[in-house]
């Protein structure tokens, strides 16, 4: 700093920049660089204020100095002056200030002009306050002066102010304190007592409440401070009318005369930049700044002032507002008129809003203020999200159970594999054509089969495999797809093999291929999704197996495949008819040939089969010839039987004559056995000897060989003599009856019972 008087021009532009633009930045970002710059301006402002006071007192004449000092002396020495003398002194002081602003020194032209303007405003305030006492801003702006405090009290309260204000307010605060030292002595108590003011603001006038309900906060504050010159003075621009009283209009004209003098031509070139920036900011963000300033300071006020307390706690907030306006007035003093009006209007709005809230509001005004502040909140209505439905169950999906997969909305519980119905997550699913699968079944159904040519599983594989009943499959496929889409598949899909077995059993019982295919179809469609190779091949192989099971039905005891087709059907018919007879002895005789044949055919090697065939055919021919003779002799009922039924006639004839020929058979039987030594080693006359002979001859192969030779010999004898032929056959059959044991007869009967059940 130079020792010469400080030139205000350079610092005016810089301080303007700080107060207008960077003041908000300091509060928001707390930038250290800006704070340092601000501290420099703060020191410079203190020095300029001190120089301003000295230059004002030194450069003015004694008349002006004497008038100012007398006003101060009267103010502090005689606090009980009348209102008329006090208003006269205030008018004189205001005229002195105006003349002092008209004739400043050359060095401090702009500085003195701004200081005179601030002093003039602060001196005009008490005059307007005296004439319009019930004002909100008057009580809130300088409350410490109401109680008649001296300068020491004011300095202590200024320390309280410093605690409330931030670093960004220091310059404004100290400059305001220095200016208040000049102006505070000129203001005394109000003519209207505090009790009356208190009642007015507690009860509230009906006009005030109506306006509060009808208008916004700024309009209501303006209505309350209708007679206040401090508000109207700031509101009024050039060519603008106000709704204030006659005194405020007088001061308005005086103010309008002074405004052209304050805007010097030397500063216009510098103010062009700031006019573009500050006016644009104040005009565009007028309402937003107004809301922010009012909202932030109302919160501070509500925290501090919760009761109807003396004006002491209000000093911080009200002085803060006063300093804010005074700082803006210092910056606006060197600006052109339009920019000054814009920024002044914005400051007026922020200032007008404050006096509404620092005072304790009535219930009506509180309700109105709440109702006015609520509409922007009421505009934010709760909008429920759009109703979403689950793709699977078609029910409403709520946010807690919502799952978005494959660009579709599911319930978390409905997000399941369409094949196995297992619950899936976003990491374990695969989708194909809008259907959800778990990864193992997706690979099994589509990837491992390699059916990429058919749309990768979009066309069912059954169409490629099954070609028998295409029409039925075409009808079944859409039904299957519709069922699969409507309801998630149950986990019981693997019951399909059980159904397959049931269908096979039913088809075996029905023995109808058409019915089998129809019943097999649903099992195939279910099996199609599980089994590989295709189930149509399984169905055909299953039917072949069924036929094999029918053809090779086991019989006991087992027979040789070669001997079975050679068994004549007439023997079976005869056996059926013979089976009707009651006695075991009668049933046992015709089975002798068949029993011996069966035993030899089962247990003898295949090389023995030709003699068996030979012996069997010869015995059959002999039986047919004997049956023909018997048919001529016997009754009509036996004659009706055919040659194939010759055994039946023979046995009935034998049954009638068996008693008379028993002894003869036994004798001739012994002679035949002696001739055929290969057949019987130890001859016997009784049945016991025959039984012992059968027991001794346990190996079956020699028995079969001896039996075949015996048959050849007997038939050779039959062909020699015709008369002996019939006797030989009868004796041969009688011996066979003796040879058969009871156990073998029972076995034969059991075997034919099973055969009958089979047929």
Swiss-Prot record:
Keywords: Acetylation, Actin-binding, Cell junction, Cell membrane, Cell projection, Cholesterol metabolism, Cytoplasm, Cytoskeleton, LIM domain, Lipid metabolism, Membrane, Metal-binding, Phosphoprotein, Steroid metabolism, Sterol metabolism, Ubl conjugation, Zinc
CDD domains: LIM_Eplin_alpha_beta
Pfam families membership: LIM (PF00412)
Segments for region (Disordered): 78-131, 146-182, 211-264, 323-381, 509-709
Biased composition (Basic and acidic residues): 96-105, 146-177, 247-258, 516-527, 556-567, 656-673
SMART domains the UniProt entry points to: LIM (SM00132)
Effect ascribed to mutating residue 25 to I: Correlated with lower plasma levels of low-density lipoprotein cholesterol; reduces protein stability
Region (Required for interaction with MYO5B): 493-513
Annotated GO biological process: actin filament bundle assembly; cell migration; cholesterol homeostasis; cholesterol metabolic process; intestinal cholesterol absorption; negative regulation of actin filament depolymerization; negative regulation of cilium assembly; ruffle organization
Cellular localisation: Cytoplasm; Cell junction, Focal adhesion; Cytoplasm, Cytoskeleton; Cytoplasm, Cytoskeleton, Stress fiber
Biased composition (Acidic residues): 674-691
Record's compositionally biased regions (Low complexity): 362-376
GO CC annotation terms, alphabetical: actin cytoskeleton; actin filament; brush border membrane; cleavage furrow; cytosol; focal adhesion; plasma membrane; ruffle
Comp. bias (Polar residues): 595-607, 644-655, 693-709
Tissue expression summary: Highly expressed in placenta, kidney, pancreas, prostate, ovary, spleen and heart. Also detected in lung, liver, brain, skeletal muscle, thymus, testis and intestine. Not detected in leukocytes. Isoform Beta expressed generally at very low levels. Isoform Alpha abundant in epithelial cells from mammary gland, prostate and in normal oral keratinocytes. Low levels in aortic endothelial cells and dermal fibroblasts. Not detectable in myocardium.
Its job: Actin-binding protein involved in actin cytoskeleton regulation and dynamics. Increases the number and size of actin stress fibers and inhibits membrane ruffling. Inhibits actin filament depolymerization. Bundles actin filaments, delays filament nucleation and reduces formation of branched filaments. Acts as a negative regulator of primary cilium formation. Plays a role in cholesterol homeostasis. Influences plasma cholesterol levels through regulation of intestinal cholesterol absorption.
Description of how the protein assembles with itself and partners: Interacts with NPC1L1; bridges NPC1L1 with MYO5B. Interacts with MYO5B; bridges NPC1L1 with MYO5B. Interacts with PXN; this complex stabilizes actin dynamics. Interacts with F-actin and G-actin. Interacts with LUZP1 (via C-terminus); both proteins restrict ciliation and may work together to regulate this process. Binds RAB40B (GTP-bound); interaction influences LIMA1 subcellular localization in lamellipodia during cell migration.
Protein name, entry field: LIM domain and actin-binding protein 1
Annotated source species: Homo sapiens (Human)
Organism lineage: Eukaryota, Metazoa, Chordata, Craniata, Vertebrata
């Amino acid at each position: 700093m130079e020792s010469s008087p400080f030139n205000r021009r350079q610092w005016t532009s810089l301080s303007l920049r700080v107060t207008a633009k960077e003041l908000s930045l300091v509060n928001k970002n707390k930038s250290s660089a800006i704070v340092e710059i601000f501290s420099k301006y703060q020191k410079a402002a203190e020095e300029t204020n001190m120089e301003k006071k000295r230059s004002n007192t030194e450069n003015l004449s004694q008349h002006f100095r004497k008038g100012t000092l007398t006003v101060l002396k009267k103010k502090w020495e005689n606090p009980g002056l009348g209102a008329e003398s006090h208003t006269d002194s205030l008018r004189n002081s205001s005229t002195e200030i105006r003349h002092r602003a008209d004739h400043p020194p050359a060095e401090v032209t702009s500085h003195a002009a701004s200081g005179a303007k601030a002093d003039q405003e602060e001196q005009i305030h008490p005059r307007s306050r005296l004439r319009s006492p019930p004002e909100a801003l008057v009580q809130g702006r300088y409350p410490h002066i109401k109680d008649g405090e001296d300068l020491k009290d004011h300095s202590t309260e200024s320390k309280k102010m410093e605690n409330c204000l931030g670093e960004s307010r220091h310059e404004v605060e100290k400059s305001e304190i220095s200016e208040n030292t000049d102006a505070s002595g000129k203001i005394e108590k109000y003519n209207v007592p505090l009790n009356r003011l208190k009642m007015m603001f507690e009860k509230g006038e009906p006009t005030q409440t109506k306006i509060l309900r009808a208008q916004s906060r700024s309009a209501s504050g303006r209505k309350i401070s209708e007679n206040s010159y401090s508000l109207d003075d700031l509101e009024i621009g050039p060519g603008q009318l106000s709704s204030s009283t006659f005194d405020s209009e007088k001061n308005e004209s005086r103010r309008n005369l002074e405004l052209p003098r304050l805007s010097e031509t030397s500063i216009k070139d510098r103010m062009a930049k700031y006019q573009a920036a500050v006016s644009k900011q104040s005009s565009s963000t007028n309402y937003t700044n107004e809301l922010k300033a009012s909202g932030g300071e109302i919160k501070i006020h509500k925290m501090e002032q919760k009761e109807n307390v003396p004006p002491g706690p209000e000093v911080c907030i009200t002085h803060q507002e006063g300093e804010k306006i005074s700082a803006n007035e210092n910056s606006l003093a060197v600006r052109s008129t339009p920019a000054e009006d814009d920024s002044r209007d914005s400051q007026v709005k922020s200032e007008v809003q404050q006096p509404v809230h620092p005072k304790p509001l009535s219930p009506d005004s509180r309700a109105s203020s709440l109702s006015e502040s609520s509409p922007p909140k009421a505009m934010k209505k709760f909008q429920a999200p759009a109703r979403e439905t689950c793709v699977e169950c078609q029910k409403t999906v709520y946010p807690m159970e919502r799952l978005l997969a494959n660009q579709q909305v599911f319930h978390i519980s409905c997000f399941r594999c369409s094949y196995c119905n297992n619950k899936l997550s976003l990491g374990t699913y695969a989708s194909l054509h809008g259907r959800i699968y778990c990864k193992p079944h997706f690979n099994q159904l589509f990837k491992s089969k390699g059916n990429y040519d058919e749309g990768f599983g979009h066309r069912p594989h059954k169409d490629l495999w099954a070609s028998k009943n295409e029409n039925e499959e075409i009808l079944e496929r859409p039904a299957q797809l519709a069922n699969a889409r409507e309801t998630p598949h149950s986990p019981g899909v693997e019951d399909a093999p059980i159904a397959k077995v049931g269908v096979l059993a039913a088809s075996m019982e029905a023995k109808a291929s058409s019915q089998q295919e129809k019943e097999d179809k649903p099992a195939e469609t279910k099996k199609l999704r599980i089994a590989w190779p295709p189930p149509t091949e399984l169905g055909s192989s299953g039917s072949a197996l069924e036929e094999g099971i029918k053809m090779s039905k086991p019989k006991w005891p087992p027979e040789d495949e070669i001997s079975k087709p050679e068994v004549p059907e007439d023997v079976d018919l005869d056996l059926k008819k013979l089976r009707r007879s009651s006695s075991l002895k009668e049933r046992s005789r015709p089975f002798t040939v068949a029993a011996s044949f069966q035993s030899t055919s089962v247990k003898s090697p295949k090389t023995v089969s030709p003699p068996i065939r030979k012996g069997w055919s010869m015995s059959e021919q002999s039986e047919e010839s004997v049956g023909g003779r018997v048919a001529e002799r016997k009754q009509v009922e036996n004659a009706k039987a055919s040659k194939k039924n010759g055994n039946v006639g023979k046995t009935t004839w034998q049954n009638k004559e068996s008693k008379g020929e028993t002894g003869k058979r036994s004798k001739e039987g012994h002679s035949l056995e002696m001739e055929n030594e290969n057949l019987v080693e130890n001859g016997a006359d009784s049945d016991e000897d025959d039984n012992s002979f059968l027991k001794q001859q346990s190996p079956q192969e020699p028995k079969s060989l001896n039996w075949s030779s015996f048959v050849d010999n007997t038939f050779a004898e039959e062909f020699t003599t015709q008369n002996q032929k019939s006797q030989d056959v009868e004796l041969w059959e009688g011996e066979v009856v003796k040879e058969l044991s009871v156990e073998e007869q029972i076995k034969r009967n059991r075997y034919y019972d099973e055969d009958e059940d089979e047929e």
